[in-house]
């Protein structure tokens, strides 16, 4: 009862604030890449406008209104805390805050059917960004088709003077283009994308480890170089492209956007590079996991050059909320790992056992596969196993606590 009442009040307050201040709202959703996309979009827009973005992963029926109000921390179960938040919202409504942002970049999650519809009814988006549609939360949506239907609402609800920014490389995303009367801008790696990334390279330090990526962006005959520090993933490139596309719609040119992105840093737990003990390098991708994101992370790990004699480790925790597809989707990862130049596979948790079993079936040496029930044990095992020059990817769903593995083998606390 209290939660329903809270949702109602927050929704009412948020809509009143938006009606008064009329900021341009940029909404972003997708199975993967929401948070990194949000960060890139905000970084580009901040070069010309006052911008507020969703704090942390505030992407639901509580988090989105709190971002609109300008609160970075929920009150939890504190009635007094919520009264203070309501008071701040009412002061915004009945008084005028000269510093209210010109733009809001709102991450919109979809854990269950109806979530995106609820959020866009609170905040009508000027720009809708759809990053990717893949298997995630299938436990609640049952099929990927139903996931797609929910995610596409962020595009179909746009008004004619708005803009849909969509991933050209994802077929299910592109199917939403005909559902909107708004301008459509596409981005990706494939030929035909409006903003296209090419010539991707890892930037290396003096000892040969990657410290970031650079690439070129092609747009209407123009070519602009982009450099992003501290990450090595395709997801960072997709996020940068989305940021540039949104920037273009609001008048931030490619050069200005590229310069802004050079200030972007990798987010904790999202393909971030961390120095490990014994002169190793960790790819920390522990924030969360989904089948598509895991495949991309494994591909990236296999592509990074290491010295002769050094090893690549993949440490995988289980992926949650996959319903009846749990076993099959984990097994796909195991088959993929066995095909690539991955030297050791370490799994954590019950679901991840399917990864290990599939890798063994596909021909990976069983002596190079280790199965552990908890992250702490896997971390201790790794401490003894890794050597100078080794590369370690650590990934898993949030509840698997895979960040514990990273803490066990990182060179210095962050």
Which stretches of residues belong to each language-model region?
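Short hydrophobic/aromatic beta-strand immediately N-terminal to the Walker A/P-loop
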Residues: 25-27, 393
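Short beta->alpha linker loops
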Residues: 32, 59, 111, 133, ...
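A conserved segment at the C-terminal end of the G1
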Residues: 28, 36-54
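ATP-dependent carboxylate-amine ligase
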Residues: 1-13, 34, 47, 140, ...
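Hydrophobic positions in the central parallel beta-sheet of the AAA+
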Residues: 104-106, 128, 164, 314, ...
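Acidic, Mg2+-coordinating active-site environments of NTP-dependent enzymes
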Residues: 21-23, 100-101, 112, 120-121, ...
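ATP-dependent carboxylate-amine ligase catalytic core
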Residues: 11, 15-21, 46-149, 237
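Short glycine/serine/threonine-rich phosphate/pyrophosphate-binding segments
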Residues: 34-40, 61-63, 111-116, 237, ...
């Amino acid at each position: 009862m209290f939660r329903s009442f809270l949702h109602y009040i927050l929704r009412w307050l948020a809509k009143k604030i938006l009606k008064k201040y009329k900021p341009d709202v940029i909404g972003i959703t997708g199975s993967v890449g929401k948070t990194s996309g949000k960060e890139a979009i905000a970084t580009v827009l901040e070069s010309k406008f006052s911008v507020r973005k969703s704090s942390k992963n505030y992407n639901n029926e509580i988090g989105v209104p709190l971002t609109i109000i300008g609160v970075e921390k929920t009150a939890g179960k504190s009635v007094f805390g919520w009264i203070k938040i309501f008071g701040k919202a009412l002061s915004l409504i009945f008084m005028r805050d000269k510093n209210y942002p010109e733009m809001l970049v709102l991450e919109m999650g979809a854990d269950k059917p109806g979530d995106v519809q609820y959020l866009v009814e609170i905040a009508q988006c000027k720009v809708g960004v759809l990053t990717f549609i893949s298997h995630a939360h299938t436990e609640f949506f049952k099929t990927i088709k139903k996931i797609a239907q929910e995610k596409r609402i962020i595009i179909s609800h746009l008004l004619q003077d708005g803009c849909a920014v969509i991933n050209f490389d994802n077929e299910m995303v592109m199917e939403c283009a005909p559902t909107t009367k708004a301008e459509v801008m596409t981005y990706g790696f494939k030929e035909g994308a409006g903003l296209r990334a090419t010539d991707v390279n890892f930037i290396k330090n003096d000892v040969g480890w990657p410290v970031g990526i650079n690439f070129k962006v092609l747009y209407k005959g123009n070519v602009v170089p982009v450099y992003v520090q501290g990450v090595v993933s395709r997801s960072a490139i997709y996020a940068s492209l989305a940021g540039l596309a949104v920037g273009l719609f609001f008048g931030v040119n490619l050069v200005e956007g590229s310069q802004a992105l050079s200030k972007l840093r990798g987010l904790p737990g999202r393909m971030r590079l961390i120095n490990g003990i014994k002169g190793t390098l960790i790819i920390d991708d522990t924030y969360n996991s989904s089948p598509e994101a895991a495949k991309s992370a494994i591909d990236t790990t296999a592509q990074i050059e290491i010295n002769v004699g050094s090893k690549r480790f993949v440490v995988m925790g289980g992926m949650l909320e996959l319903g009846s597809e749990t076993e099959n989707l984990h097994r796909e990862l195991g088959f993929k790992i066995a095909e690539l130049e991955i030297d050791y596979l370490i799994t954590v948790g019950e679901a991840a056992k399917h990864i290990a079993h599939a890798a063994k079936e596909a021909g990976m040496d069983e002596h190079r596969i280790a199965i552990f029930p908890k992250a702490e044990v896997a971390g201790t095992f790794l401490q003894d196993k890794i050597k100078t020059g080794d590369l370690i990817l650590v990934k898993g769903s949030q509840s698997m606590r895979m960040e514990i593995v990273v803490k066990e083998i990182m060179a210095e606390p962050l």
